[in-house]
Amino acid sequence: MATALITGATAGIGAAYAKLLAKEGFDLVLVARDLPRLKGVAKELSKLYKIKAETIKADLTKPAQLAKVEKRLANNSKPIEVLINNAGFGLKDSFLVSNLAKEQELLDVLVTAPMRLSHAVLPGMIKRNSGSIVNVSSVASFIAGGTYSAAKSYLTVFSEYLHTELRDTNIKVSALCPGFTRTEFHARGKMKMSGLPNYMWTAVDQVVAKSWRYVKAGKVICIPGWQYMLLSSIARIAPRPVVRKLGIKIRRKQR
């Protein structure tokens, strides 16, 4: 069986991707900070889908712990066929008053970790001429919304670059750019979401299913939901002052 490694695998998009891939017969390497919860997910999926599930407890802001995941990805005796760079978090406060250490941790998780993990897994994929990488970005990557948007913009552009660089191979790279998705993400970030209209929410299973279809089809940018396809299209063609105002308006509503 092929093996998939998923970061941030205990909840939200990561957990949904783990379930989808297990259902398709992939063995799993699940990565997260919460080991008891991680083992619970691994046990549940192993039992339900008759697959093997490894766990790696790792805080991706810590270089030594990130290195453990890199080492597993580089182990070609147990190759990783699919890498899902999903781990992440958001910050509620404006950059002007936020904790600088938290801002740095956000960059460590959203930028440094996916870059290093992709670099670790790609040599094996290139040697086998097979593999897929999904970088979980955001529609926030198309607007101006602080460090989070900037980091997600990196992921989107990085994915586009790798997709193009590897176009003559059988390796697929895709950026998943969801909008507001019903997960623990916003509650954990203590963001105010009560005023968001119901039609702006997307279901996590549908988000992941569309992403995986796009990966299989070799498509580089996946934006689930008609509302976010429209929003991203507007963001790409609108004058930048309009995009900047939209970004700051959305951010301020979450505080």
Language model feature labels by segment:
Residues 35-36, 57-68, 100:
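The beta1-alpha1 cofactor-binding region of Rossmann-like NAD(H)/NADP(H)-dependent oxidoreductases
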Residues 10-11:
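Conserved glycine-rich cofactor-binding loop
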Residues 138:
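Residue(s) in the substrate-gating loop at a strand-loop-helix junction
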Residues 94-107:
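Substrate-binding pocket helix/loop in short-chain dehydrogenase/reductase
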Residues 163-230:
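SDR active-site lid
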Residues 24-40:
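Conserved glycine-rich Rossmann-like NAD(P)H-binding loop of the short-chain dehydrogenase/reductase
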Residues 118, 151-154:
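Active-site helix of classical SDR
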